[in-house]
Every structure is written in structure tokens, then in C-alpha cells.
Amino acid sequence: MKNLAGLMKQAQQMQQNMQEMQTRLEAMEIRGEAGAGLVKVTLSGKGEMKGIEIDPKLIDPNDAEMLQDLIVAAHRDAKSRLETLAAEEMQKVTGGISLPPGMKLPF
């Protein structure tokens, strides 16, 4: 019974640590780039787009498709960086313990 109480306490501490990590992530802004930095997208830690910067040299009414592709690529880059950062933070909180597929904390 004592071991069960200890496990429950550890689980509660991990849950609190994960909530703190989630709060830290939500406060962050992550930037992705494309076209050698000519298009930049900023996402919140929740993955919501906060801003976009486009170098004026790219604005060509005759070639909107290239600009559209670069915006998508910059967003994809920012999203990838966010996912990597979230995974790194999760490793810190869980001490490298992998959770079963589909299991998310807090419970």
C-alpha cells in the first residue's frame, strides 16, 4: 500500500510539472522561415498563427503561387519547431519515460 501511495504522489507531481510545462509552452512564440528567411511565420505555443512577415521583394502580382508556397513552407517549419520543442520539454518533465500511444497527461 505504501508503494501505491508513493506512485500516486509521483503521478501527481508529474501532472503538476506537465501543467507548468504546458503553461510555459503556451507563453512561447516560435518562428519558422522559408525562402532563406524572406517569409517568416510566428506561432504561439498553442500552434496559433500570431504573425507573418514577407520581404517586399517577394510581392509580385504575376507570381503569387511562389509566395503562397513559401508561406505554407514557413508555417510548416514553425509547426515542426514547435513539435520538437514540446517533445523536448516533455522529456524533461517525464524524465525520458515514454507514455503509451494515445495516453496524454495530465490524466
UniProtKB/Swiss-Prot annotation:
This protein's source sits in the domain of life called Bacteria
> Could you tell me which Gene3D superfamilies the record lists for this protein?
Nucleoid-associated protein YbaB-like domain
What are the GO cellular component annotations? bacterial nucleoid; cytosol
Subcellular location(s) per record? Cytoplasm, Nucleoid
Q: Which GO terms describe its molecular function?
A: DNA binding
Its principal location?
A: cytoplasm
A single Pfam family it belongs to is YbaB_DNA_bd
Tell me the leader sequence span: none
Q: Which InterPro entries match?
A: YbaB-like_sf, YbaB/EbfC
Q: Which UniProt keywords apply?
A: Cytoplasm, DNA-binding
What is said about its interaction partners and assembly? Homodimer.
The similarity comment for this entry is:
Belongs to the YbaB/EbfC family.
* Role summary: Binds to DNA and alters its conformation. May be involved in regulation of gene expression, nucleoid organization and DNA protection.
Give the matching PANTHER family. NUCLEOID-ASSOCIATED PROTEIN YBAB (PTHR33449:SF1)
Name under which the protein is recorded? Nucleoid-associated protein Acry_1999
